[in-house]
Amino acid sequence: MERRYLKNPFQDFIGGENTAFASDEEHIKNLICTYVDTILEHCHPNSDDEDDRGDLYVGNAGIAFMFWKLASCEQTRDLYPPALQHASAFIRNAKANAERFKKRSAERYSFLCGNAGIYAVSAAISQAVKDTEELSNDLANFKSGIPSSKEFIHTKNGCDEVLVGRAGYLSGCYWLNDVLPDKKITDDDLISICQLIVTSGREYSKMNNSPLPLMFQYHGTEYLGAAHGLCAILHMLLDSPWFRTVPISAPAAELREIKRSIDYFLVLQDAEGNFPVALEDLRSGRDKRLVHWCHGAPGAVYMLAKAYLIFKEEKYLTSLRRSADLVWKKGFLRKGPGICHGVAGNGYVFLLLFRLTNEMKYLYRAHKFMELLTNSEFKQRARIPDNPHSLYEGVAGTVCFLVDILEPEQAYFPFMDVFH
């Protein structure tokens, strides 16, 4: 069976060398333009394709986010002057598709794969183009997810994870509060959602005799990774107003359960630095270790970084370094250039570590992941994703990664900024 990753073709950073990346800037900008031109050639915002959900994950809202990011970054806003026009066109189409799903309560708080993400990105674009009426409508539609997220403690298939659940909705709330000039989502609303997530995890854990104080399931599987599982849910709890004060304002029981769940997760890290896909893998003895943002260490790093920033315990930084070393060894994925399970998503690990430690080794490694995108072996052996131009599977996400390499001090994986 062919390996999931390419052998790392690069020499690692040599300590003490004076590495300059200025020569990469023109190459990165040219690569951005190439990817953007490809997206515009193959993706049309006025398409009437009924199969186009329009969501952030693989739909037009994700492409709109990419154009918004291009327009928001000092290094790239002049590179593509019509970026906001394209962002507006793609988000209009996404919102037209969202109308078909408005009556579904779960869609209102589904962020990456539902209506909530569409309206969040639209709000940011409306703010950028100074359309106050549309901004008001977008925020009203987005905020309709607050009561919808509280209708149930549990659902049959799970309602807490990042792609379609409450943790994802929280990530959208935090992002909007960061990018809009006034705080649009109140602390009370954020805390009420966090409280419900904790209650859900606590009750599920007790009902299923879980070894963790908080545990969750998605379609019957107790996932641990960022897309559907525990680590991203814990990350969003750590991002809450509970942990933005000194001392921490989380209730004692919630603080204890969150911290113990993080520490249990930490001991699951294997000798290579990776984490299991699901708790079931430990029980069954399956050795399915993936090095993706969605499953594995590349997605776990954001929760670990947030835990390190809050609790200041060295064990979290040690775990982060081990995760990064694993990604450097086995993270040059053949599944494509995307951020969910591709090269750009794994490259983001090093931008995170660079911001956290200010060590040039990690910025050097991020640049090498950028270089792989034009590597002849990668171009020959990488697979074409199902949605090759999208934000999470395709090159729209790659563009975001490249933009962030140009401004590494502000870099963040989409909707998972641990430093805000």
From Swiss-Prot:
It comes from Drosophila pseudoobscura pseudoobscura (Fruit fly). SMART domains: LANC_like. PANTHER family: LANC-LIKE PROTEIN, LANC-LIKE PROTEIN 3. Belongs to the LanC-like protein family. Gene3D superfamilies: 1.50.10.10. GO terms for biological process: carbohydrate metabolic process; peptide modification. This is LanC-like protein 3 homolog. Pfam families: LANC_like. One of its GO terms (cellular component) is plasma membrane.
